[in-house]
A protein has these predicted regions:
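Catalytic nucleophile-loop/oxyanion-hole region of alpha/beta-hydrolase
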Residues: 14, 45-48, 71-106, 110, ...
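The serine-hydrolase catalytic nucleophile loop
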Residues: 42-54, 68, 252
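Conserved alpha/beta-hydrolase
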Residues: 55-75
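Alpha/beta-hydrolase-fold enzymes
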Residues: 122-202
């Protein structure tokens, strides 16, 4: 029997669209310490985030889990566009909504992000001193380092498609899409040995739409962003969950971020990038470590 409720809410975002969110509220007395959560590159909330939010809610933490604009059930056109600026804005929109909610505790507000969302976690934590803490899980925090893992011939083909899509967008042409998760011999954004394992592990089982694609122009945004450089300005507690055998997100920059942040903490999870999720090698221990971090810092806030 669960000890929480889940409600779907929609939060206005930008001039003409909104964010589709799940709000988890524990049965304990309000106001609740709260975790604002979102997925990584191409991810939607139905793709593996519920087990984390449910575990937190079962242990007394509210959770606000949202789809970025252009993704999942949130609004925005074109579909499957990744904009770092807009995704940061979406986190801030969700945080602002949480701060206005009577059932959520302003003084115990955390942000949580997985994979590519590690970029946003460092950026936002460095600019929002009111946060009680931040968690970045199997995080990508250095775009050039991430792109450096892509073999040169494949990187050239991806870049050419991205530039063509960007120029086409300027002239009003429909977006060019790239596959997101593919096998190592195919052309796609994530072409690691475990990419298809991750795709299958995270695929929603409730019919939630999750196209395995991304607008090609999105890669140009990713390639140059380096929020690891902001780690030294983060004043809130920061937990970096870094997978020991991550083949997608470079572990060096993530480990450096934990060391540079004045209140940084590091947990090295067993296995690869997708082993932090339900069904993965270290999912249970990752839940335990993240809850301990949240509980400890919620008590001090």
């Amino acid at each position: 029997m669960t000890d929480f409720t889940r409600e779907q809410v929609r939060i206005p975002a930008g001039a003409d669209t909104d964010l589709d969110c799940w709000q988890y509220l524990p049965s304990s007395p309000a106001p609740h310490p709260t975790v604002v959560m979102a997925h990584g590159i191409g991810g939607v909330k139905a793709a593996g985030l519920a087990p984390f939010a449910e575990f937190f809610a079962d242990n007394g933490f509210a959770a606000l889990v949202f789809d970025y604009r252009h993704w999942g059930r949130s609004g925005g056109s074109p579909r499957e566009l990744l904009s770092i600026r807009r995704q940061r804005e979406d986190y801030r929109t969700a945080l602002a909504w949480a701060r206005r909610h009577d059932s959520l505790d302003n003084d115990r507000l955390f942000i949580w992000g997985t994979s590519f969302a590690g970029m946003h976690i460092l950026d936002i934590a460095a600019s929002d001193p009111a946060l009680a803490g931040a968690i970045a899980q199997c995080p990508l925090v250095d775009g050039p380092a991430g792109m450096g893992k892509v073999p040169a011939p494949r990187a050239l083909r991806l870049t050419a498609t991205a530039v063509a899509d960007l120029l086409g967008g300027v002239t009003g042409k429909p977006p060019k899409y790239l596959p997101l998760s593919v096998g190592p011999d195919s052309l796609g954004v994530i072409a690691t040995d475990d990419a298809l394992t991750g795709l299958h592990r995270l695929s929603p089982d409730d019919g939630e739409p999750w196209p395995n694609r991304i607008t090609a122009r999105s890669l140009l945004d990713i390639a140059v962003h380096r929020p690891v450089r902001a780690a030294g300005r983060i004043r809130c507690p920061l937990l970096m969950v870094v997978a020991e055998s991550d083949t997608m997100a470079p572990t060096g920059p993530a480990t450096q971020a934990a060391a540079r942040a004045p209140r940084g903490e590091l947990y090295r999870s067993r296995g690869g990038h997708y082993d932090v999720y339900a069904g993965g090698l270290d999912h249970t221990d990752v839940l335990r470590v993240e809850l301990e971090f949240l509980t400890r810092h919620a008590a001090r806030a």
